[in-house]
């Protein structure tokens, strides 16, 4: 998923 990383889970927009 997109929100698997700590820094991504805060802003789940496009997969970072």
UniProtKB/Swiss-Prot annotation:
Disulfide bonds: 2-16, 3-12, 8-15
Modified residues (Pyrrolidone carboxylic acid (Glu)): 1
Tissue-by-tissue expression: Expressed by the venom duct.
Molecular function via GO: toxin activity
Tagged with keyword Disulfide bond: yes
A cellular-component GO term for this protein: extracellular region
Modified residues (Cysteine amide): 16
Keywords: Amidation, Disulfide bond, Pyrrolidone carboxylic acid, Secreted, Toxin
Keyword Cell division belongs to the record: no
UniProt-annotated location(s): Secreted
Family the entry assigns: Belongs to the conotoxin M superfamily.
Domain notes: The cysteine framework is III (CC-C-C-CC).
Name assigned to this protein: Conotoxin ar3g
Organism annotation: Conus araneosus (Cobweb cone)
